[in-house]
Amino acid sequence: IDYLKIPIQTLKVGSLGIHNLLGLAKVKKARLLIASTSEVYGDPTVHPQTEDYWGNVNPVGPRGVYDEAKRFQEAMTMAYHTYHGLETRIARIFNTYGPRMRLNDGRVLPAFIGQALRGEDLTIFGDGSQTRSFCYVDDLVDGLFRLLMSDYAQPVNIGNPDEISIGEFAE
């Protein structure tokens, strides 16, 4: 997973990168769509997560730099919306799949596909009871377009509302 290899750069993109992007959008009077993530919820205690759930994030855990970078991006985006009147949209993207996925990106679906293509047994971490929702890329693009064209400025979850356990998925 890239953010594990480049944690400082990940945090800089989440802070300096979003600040520069929002500043440019302000100057150009552009509407800006931010691609956030379901990882802002961390290890959720609520399933499925709704947009008003604040999450359960460990800021110094193994995923902390990514989770916190995205949470900061959302906070900065809402600040620009509130204080500068910038037209912003925040999409919290859940597990997306489709053509041209990287099979080694650390997510369960591409990992399973890669293992199956190599004729290997599927690796399940934990007891398999962890749940995920999967969203096909075409549905994601449709959701992003609809959000961008809407007047809604609060974060929006884009994914499949139905979750499946990793164990069930592996079967």
PLM feature segments, named:
Residues 1-96, 116, 126, 138, ...:
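N-terminal Rossmann-like NAD(P)+-binding domain of SDR-like oxidoreductases, especially those catalyzing
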Residues 61, 101-105, 162:
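Residue-level signature of the cytosolic catalytic core of signaling kinases
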Residues 101, 130-132:
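Heptad-repeat alpha-helical coiled-coil signaling segments
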Residues 111-117:
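Activation segment of eukaryotic-like protein kinases
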